[in-house]
Amino acid sequence: MKIAVLFFGATADAVGARELELAASAKTAAKSLIDQLSKDHPALAKHKLLIAVNEEYADPDTILNDGDELALFTAVSGG
């Protein structure tokens, strides 16, 4: 199955892209894709990530389906 992965802010900088399309096996959890991305792009692992699946906040254990959109971003804070 194919998953569109969108990167925002620091996650885009860490990966060097705003969007990637990844192949995944059926019943893959979002965390599995994030772990693989972190191995391929070690700078990504330095960030505490928030995720959304199909434009809704999601848990890392969310099972992805073919054609889903996984968005990765960091929490925004100010001071």
What is each model feature region?
Residues M1-G78:
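Ubiquitin-like/PB1-type beta-grasp interaction modules and other compact soluble beta-rich domains
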